[in-house]
């Protein structure tokens, strides 16, 4: 049988499969998918986040094979992974550092969307699906942080689950349901482990929907103008796949540095102490990617008020397409918005710093000012800038 016959047979098999399950057509669509020709390296962040998600799922599944979700054995099983499982230390550090790298990519991805107006029509649903992914990521990361069953894991779970008790009438039953009893204990750990395993696969489904929404109207671009002809676009492959690999290289260099040289830099030393319900840590601190929201939570003395503000800080992102009244997408052509954007970024970083500090003065008072500006940016600054700002002239073509 010569090569031509073999090639025809293999093509026939591919066509037979593709007719019934169009996998190959779908992959071909990605190859020929037309993308704006002026995308910069900030558009790599979506692909980087996708790679980070795959790494988390692979390492998480392998770690789950060796983890014991029981309050008497969870801490020891993690230490056993570190010492007795082949390359267990690498798996654990890759998973722990990978969570931080995933959030870093997502935060930059969101910041890029805010600056370039990627939430504006016709991409509102694309933005909303992205925020839902972010919410589920936060829930997944929180439950994952509980699993090592160290001091910070236990007390972090106690503090955060207790927040639901602030809800009038139904708060206490919700907390008891979350705990599976009257305190954080074995049922809590078991259900957190089950949900932590499940949620990444829900994220995968949402990522697919995110991509479907993206391909419906195409990517936004740094100029924030619509594509008018095929001259404004280039195929995603090979042009942007090659560009993505450059971003992957930078990402993996930073990733490798933390894994091999500073694996615990982003963690907390108290989590290397087994959970003890009788001893409260001097300072309960969440992971760095929750610190801005933690600062918002602690900014007011009322528990219900803090919970309301913390969840409101994320809900306001859903309303963003309608709060920003400007018709111009890109911050490059909005001089006043550009200043407001960088002030907002500084405010978010400052909230992260304040979230890492003890609940004492002057941090509480400063936090209130920072939280006030956070909400003013969305509810006051954006609507007013959209009405009164004089944007720069938009270019005609990409």
Swiss-Prot record:
Protein topology in the membrane: Multi-pass membrane protein
CDD domains the record matches: cytochrome_b_C (cd00290), Cytochrome_b_N (cd00284)
Cystine residue pairs: none
Binding site for heme b b562: 95, 196
Keyword Cytoplasm carried by entry: no
Transmembrane segments: 45-65, 96-116, 129-149, 164-184, 192-212, 245-265, 277-297, 304-324, 339-359, 366-386
GO cellular component: plasma membrane; respiratory chain complex III
Residues annotated as binding heme b b566: 109, 210
Keywords in alphabetical order: Cell membrane, Electron transport, Heme, Iron, Membrane, Metal-binding, Respiratory chain, Transmembrane, Transmembrane helix, Transport
Keyword tRNA processing appears in the UniProt entry: no
BP terms from Gene Ontology: respiratory electron transport chain
Cofactor note: Binds 2 heme b groups non-covalently.
Cofactor: heme b
Subcellular location: Cell membrane
Pfam families: Cytochrom_B_C, Cytochrome_B
Description of how the protein assembles with itself and partners: The main subunits of complex b-c1 are: cytochrome b, cytochrome c1 and the Rieske protein.
Family: Belongs to the cytochrome b family.
Note in the entry: Heme 1 (or BL or b562) is low-potential and absorbs at about 562 nm, and heme 2 (or BH or b566) is high-potential and absorbs at about 566 nm.
Function noted in UniProt: Component of the ubiquinol-cytochrome c reductase complex (complex III or cytochrome b-c1 complex), which is a respiratory chain that generates an electrochemical potential coupled to ATP synthesis.
Name of the protein this chain belongs to: Cytochrome b
Lineage: Bacteria, Pseudomonadati, Pseudomonadota, Alphaproteobacteria, Rickettsiales
Gene that specifies this protein: petB
């Amino acid at each position: 049988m010569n090569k031509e016959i073999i090639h025809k047979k293999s093509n026939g098999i591919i066509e037979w499969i593709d007719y019934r399950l169009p996998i190959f057509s779908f992959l071909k669509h990605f190859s020929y998918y037309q993308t704006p020709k002026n995308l910069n390296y900030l558009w790599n962040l979506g692909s980087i986040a996708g790679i980070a998600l795959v790494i988390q799922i692979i390492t998480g599944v392998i770690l789950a094979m060796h983890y014991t979700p029981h309050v008497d054995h969870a801490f020891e099983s993690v230490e056993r992974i570190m010492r007795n499982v082949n390359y267990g230390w690498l798996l654990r550090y890759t998973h722990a550092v990978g969570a931080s790298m995933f959030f870093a990519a997502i935060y930059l991805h969101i910041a890029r969307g805010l600056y370039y107006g990627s939430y504006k029509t016709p991409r509102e649903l694309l933005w909303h699906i992205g925020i839902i992914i972010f919410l589920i990521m936060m829930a997944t990361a929180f439950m994952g942080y509980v699993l090592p069953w160290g001091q910070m894991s236990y007390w972090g779970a106690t503090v955060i689950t207790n927040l639901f008790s602030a809800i009038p009438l139904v708060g206490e039953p919700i907390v008891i349901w979350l705990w599976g009893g009257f305190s954080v204990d074995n049922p809590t750990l078991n259900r957190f482990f089950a949900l932590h395993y499940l949620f990444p696969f829900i994220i995968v489904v949402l990522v697919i929907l995110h991509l479907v929404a993206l391909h419906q109207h195409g990517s936004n671009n740094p100029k924030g103008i619509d594509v008018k002809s095929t001259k404004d676009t280039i195929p995603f492959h090979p042009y942007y796949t090659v560009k993505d690999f450059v971003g992957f290289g930078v990402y993996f260099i930073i990733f490798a540095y933390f894994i091999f040289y500073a694996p615990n830099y982003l963690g907390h030393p108290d989590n290397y102490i087994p959970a003890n319900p009788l001893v409260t840590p001097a300072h309960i601190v969440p992971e760095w990617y929750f610190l801005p929201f933690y600062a918002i939570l602690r900014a007011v003395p009322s528990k219900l008020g803090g919970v309301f503000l913390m969840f409101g800080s994320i809900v306001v992102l859903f309303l963003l397409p309608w709060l920003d009244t400007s018709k111009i997408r890109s911050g490059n052509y909005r001089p006043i918005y550009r200043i407001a954007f960088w002030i907002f970024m500084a405010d978010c970083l400052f909230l992260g710093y304040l979230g890492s500090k003890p609940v004492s003065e002057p941090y509480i008072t400063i936090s209130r000012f920072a939280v006030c500006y956070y909400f003013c940016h969305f509810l006051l600054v954006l609507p007013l800038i959209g009405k009164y700002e004089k944007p720069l002239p938009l270019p005609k073509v990409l």
